[in-house]
Design a protein with these regions (language model features):
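RNase H catalytic domain
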Residues: 4-15, 50-124
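RNase H-like nuclease fold core
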Residues: 1-42, 46, 50-57, 73, ...
Length: 141
């Protein structure tokens, strides 16, 4: 099973569109929605967390967010300078711990590739679903 996830952040409104696509053989499931978020990194981490739930902890979750993977692996060395950065950092750490607790494998893939291989297509679909998630927020307005 391969799961691709992405986030599309709107800084002005403080929301992130979330997109997840799960490929299991010939079957494909998709999900798009939005969440309140302080940063794109929080959105990316939430997308990975949601993907781990939707895929029931099976297979590998692919993301194009190096920062999210750094949080999951505990490699983030940045020191928050402002109160807002500190709060964002703590939320990102929270989601990273939730992902680690589920014990699912995560891997990095390149973003915005133009090829027709499985990974680029999966990532592009997740990206499109994340944008659709943002559109769902805008449609509520």
């Amino acid at each position: 099973m391969k799961t691709y996830c992405d986030s599309s952040f709107d800084d002005r409104r403080g929301i992130a569109g979330i997109g997840v696509t799960i490929v299991d053989g010939e079957k494909r499931r998709t999900y798009s929605s939005w969440i309140r978020a302080r940063s794109n990194n929080e959105g990316e981490l939430f997308a990975i967390h949601l993907a781990s739930i939707l895929s029931e902890g099976r297979g590998i979750i692919y993301t194009d967010s190096q920062c999210a993977l750094s949080y999951i692996r505990g490699d983030v060395k940045d020191k928050p300078r402002t109160r807002e950065q500190y709060i964002n950092h703590k939320y990102c750490e929270y989601w990273a711990k939730q992902i680690k607790r589920r014990g699912i494998a995560t891997e990095k893939i390149k973003a915005h590739q133009k090829g027709f291989d499985v990974h680029s297509m999966g990532n592009r679909i997740a990206d499109l679903l994340a944008n659709e998630g943002r559109a769902k927020f805008y449609a509520r307005q």
